[in-house]
Amino acid sequence: MTNHHFVLFEDELWRHFATLVQARPLFALRCGAFTAQERLTALTGETVSGLCRSHLLGCFGPEAGPFSLLHDGRPLLLVNARARDLNWLHDLAAAPINTVYLDNGDLLGASISPGLASAVLYFLREQQIAEARDELCRFAHVVELPPADRPRLIRFPWDLITFAGEQIVRDLPLL
């Protein structure tokens, strides 16, 4: 797809799923045919890293730690772990580096340089997404998706069930 490092991140709303995600990150919950990580891997053909709570990072994060993603100078493409519909991802990957996608104020995704990533990785690792979003908005081009283009974001555990049928249909081409 591109020359990016693909990174899924948990945001503050992981707490809504606390009973389901004590031993796994939010991006490991299945909705439709895939988990968010499996879906992104199937869509891009790339290895997908994850940023999650510190007690899970050793198992689900980058092997050498989050800051190892900066070592080779490739840009990062960040994807919110609550996003189920990834139709917007190709546009973000094709956008200029340092572009941020917002969905009604929520950080949906970003294509960022390693320099800008070094300023926000701490916030992402700590699920302080509001701070990361504010920092990204200071230095990057911001795109607020119009209502018609907004993807489905899971917000509560029952969304995994509610969105499952629709998501299976979206996942069929990736199977």
Roles of regions detected by a PLM:
Residues 1-175:
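Terminal amphipathic alpha-helical/low-complexity segments used for targeting or macromolecular assembly
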